[in-house]
Amino acid sequence: MAAELTSTKLNAENHLLLDQPLLRLPHELARRNFKSVQRLVEREREYVIHALKEAANASLSNDQTPDQTLAALDSMLARMQNLKRKMESIQQEEKKIQNQSRKRIQHLEHLHQIPSLADVKYDQWSRIRLDRLVVDHMLRSGYTESAQRLAQEKGIEDLVDLDVFVQCQRIAQSLRRGETKDALRWCNENKAALKKSQFNLEFELRLQQYIEMLRTGDRGKLMDAMAHAKRYLTPYTETQSKEIHRAAGLLAFPQDTKAEPYKSMYSFDRWNHLSDLFIRTHHELLSLPSSPLLHIALSAGLSALKTPSCHSAYTSSSSNSLSTATSVCPICSTELNELARNMPYAHHAKSYVESDPIVLPNGRIYGQQRLLDMSKKLGCVETGKVKDPTTGEIFDESEMKKVYIM
């Protein structure tokens, strides 16, 4: 009895390992909002203090007329009003983030109030988490409208990162269309954070602009490309010298060249590379997992259940799908068999073998008594016959051979 209670006891901490991004992203967004406010206030403070000193000195020295002094004060007031509007907008965003964090903390707190895996409340909580994982997967796959509708239908808008992924997919799609404007604007907004990134997104975007100028073959564009490289590429000489040298060599090759690496640099496939690079950079800056959480959850479950027989020559999902009584093993199912193929096998320290194992002519091994009982329950075989519960094949009882394990 004690062992049974232990096996059904809910360990909330282990369950929450998968849900760390649920709180990490709002925290990261709140931190970025605070940094934005800090930069705005510092910039405007420096401007106003400097402008006040100039206006006061000019007024005392009679270098300005009263109208000019009033105009300077009006300019400062206008800037402060503009700062107020920006801070009000940021405050609204901050309230939204705080509300999301509150809802997410409440969702996670509910798990600590569930004592057992057998509790009906755990099924309800797990269903909400599954809905979250599905929405997350859909957002990452680009199905933003479907993800939004599912989140609204399930009432979990505050538990998923709709706005973040919608913006990410919008910019990624613009790059696939051959546009760099939105991505460069995003880089400018996150310039400070990008300095710590392991990826070189802004350099790659500027390099692509340079390539597009050369692609035209126009002499005027050639001069623009050289000026562009001097302004935007040369600051990266210390870290990207190899790529800059290649970019310089590109001046001597037309867009239809067969010479590498210039052929690859002119290739339109670079836009897909830039789109993928942006997504990786975006997720890194916001501390988002590189893989969908649904994949991570599935990988753990698949590895825990997978055995060598799931992908053996005698077991295939296609044969299972044709049988009237399919295997209960999820790894052997048509939906998950290929997905689990590259997963590691489960670590089984103990083996559990039937006390009366027999082997059928098709090579499958079962417990004799359990096989006979199942054949009787199915009620679709003649006397003296047995049915393989996995493949549906029928054999004579005399064809069963006893198995001895050494």
From Swiss-Prot:
<keyword id="KW-0539">Nucleus</keyword>
<keyword id="KW-0479">Metal-binding</keyword>
<dbReference type="InterPro" id="IPR044063">
    <property type="entry name" value="ZF_RING_GID"/>
</dbReference>
<dbReference type="GO" id="GO:0005737">
    <property type="term" value="C:cytoplasm"/>
</dbReference>
<feature type="domain" description="CTLH">
    <location>
        <begin position="164"/>
        <end position="221"/>
    </location>
</feature>
<dbReference type="InterPro" id="IPR045098">
    <property type="entry name" value="Fyv10_fam"/>
</dbReference>
<dbReference type="GO" id="GO:0005634">
    <property type="term" value="C:nucleus"/>
</dbReference>
<dbReference type="GO" id="GO:0043161">
    <property type="term" value="P:proteasome-mediated ubiquitin-dependent protein catabolic process"/>
</dbReference>
<protein>
    <recommendedName>
        <fullName>Protein fyv10</fullName>
    </recommendedName>
</protein>
<dbReference type="GO" id="GO:0061630">
    <property type="term" value="F:ubiquitin protein ligase activity"/>
</dbReference>
<dbReference type="InterPro" id="IPR006595">
    <property type="entry name" value="CTLH_C"/>
</dbReference>
<dbReference type="InterPro" id="IPR006594">
    <property type="entry name" value="LisH"/>
</dbReference>
<feature type="zinc finger region" description="RING-Gid-type">
    <location>
        <begin position="329"/>
        <end position="391"/>
    </location>
</feature>
<dbReference type="GO" id="GO:0008270">
    <property type="term" value="F:zinc ion binding"/>
</dbReference>
<dbReference type="GO" id="GO:0045721">
    <property type="term" value="P:negative regulation of gluconeogenesis"/>
</dbReference>
<feature type="domain" description="LisH">
    <location>
        <begin position="126"/>
        <end position="158"/>
    </location>
</feature>
<keyword id="KW-0862">Zinc</keyword>
<dbReference type="Pfam" id="PF10607">
    <property type="entry name" value="CTLH"/>
</dbReference>
<comment type="function">
    <text>Involved in the proteasome-dependent degradation of fructose-1,6-bisphosphatase.</text>
</comment>
<dbReference type="InterPro" id="IPR013144">
    <property type="entry name" value="CRA_dom"/>
</dbReference>
<keyword id="KW-0863">Zinc-finger</keyword>
<dbReference type="InterPro" id="IPR024964">
    <property type="entry name" value="CTLH/CRA"/>
</dbReference>
<comment type="similarity">
    <text>Belongs to the FYV10 family.</text>
</comment>
<dbReference type="GO" id="GO:0034657">
    <property type="term" value="C:GID complex"/>
</dbReference>
<keyword id="KW-0963">Cytoplasm</keyword>
